């Protein structure tokens, strides 16, 4: 059985399997591979999934992913190693050419090959904007090398150039890596983060907490969520997170 989900789904499952023995036993009984796509999966979620697997079946289930989009029909890169970490993308699918273009301090990955769309239906202007002068499709995705000394290991996701922004000071904010740092630093209490600050003087973060914050609050299990989030211990936890990331 191959199980496919987006990162938010895996986050919910990883959290539930920590305490739900029936779910953990049934869910892991037949799965041979996990596959995620749509966004980056935070390393703490990987670690939590692996902990549940080792606890229940005594080994780790293969976790893999892919990078692509509708225009690449649908994926462009895929890890070929069993030993991958969060953000690893691996190598291009056979027949696909890659071009790495320096842009805004990062490397944008661009595609050319038989699986790439020839353009947008009845959209000549959008088509012209999507391709460069060598007919490579401009993805807006940024990548780095997993190991610059061994390029056969492939590429790692480095965020979306399209979502990066500048502060009023002129400083570029690399949203993808910063979001990953906040989620990792706040685990297991942070489910997702929206990075803010476009044209402002400082970076902000809108944090979506997990139900695990209730364990910090020292309140009854049925306490209103507003009371939980305003509990001194919860506020201190997130203040410490901001301080540690500064």
Regions from the PLM with identified roles:
Residues 116, 151-181, 214-232:
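Adenylate-forming
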Residues 49, 181-184:
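Hydrophobic C-terminal alpha-helix "anchor/cap" residues
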Residues 165, 191-201, 239-246:
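Conserved C-terminal "lid"/linker of ANL adenylate-forming enzymes
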Residues 1-106, 201-202, 209-211, 216-219, ...:
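Conserved adenylate-forming
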Residues 98-100, 141-145, 195:
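A structural signal for short hydrophobic beta-strand segments in well-ordered beta-sheet cores
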Residues 142, 185-212:
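C-terminal boundary motif of the adenylate-forming
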Residues 107-167:
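Conserved ATP-binding/catalytic segment of the ANL
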Residues 100-102, 111-113, 159, 207-209:
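Flexible glycine-/small-residue-rich
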């Amino acid at each position: 059985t191959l199980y496919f989900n987006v990162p938010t789904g895996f986050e919910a499952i990883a959290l539930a399997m920590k305490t739900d023995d029936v779910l953990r036993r049934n869910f892991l009984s037949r799965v041979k591979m996990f596959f995620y796509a749509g966004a980056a999966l935070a390393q703490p979620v990987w670690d939590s999934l692996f902990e549940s697997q080792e606890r229940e079946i005594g080994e780790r289930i293969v976790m893999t992913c892919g990078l692509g989009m509708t225009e690449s029909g649908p994926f462009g890169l895929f890890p070929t190693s069993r030993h991958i970490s969060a953000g690893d993308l691996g190598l291009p699918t056979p027949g696909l050419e890659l071009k790495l273009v320096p842009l805004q301090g990062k490397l944008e990955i661009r595609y050319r090959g038989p699986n790439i769309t020839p353009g947008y239906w009845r959209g000549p202007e959008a088509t012209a904007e999507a391709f460069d002068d060598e007919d490579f499709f401009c993805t807006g995705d940024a990548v780095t090398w997993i190991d610059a000394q061994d390029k056969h290991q492939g590429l790692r996701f480095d965020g979306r150039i399209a979502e990066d922004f500048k502060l009023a000071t002129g400083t570029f904010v690399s949203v993808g890596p910063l979001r990953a740092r906040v989620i990792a630093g706040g685990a297991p209490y942070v489910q997702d983060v929206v990075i803010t600050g476009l044209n402002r003087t400082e970076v902000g973060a809108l944090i979506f907490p997990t139900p695990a914050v209730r364990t910090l609050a020292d309140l009854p299990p049925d306490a209103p969520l507003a009371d939980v989030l305003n509990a001194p211990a919860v506020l201190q936890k997130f203040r410490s997170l901001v301080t540690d990331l500064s």
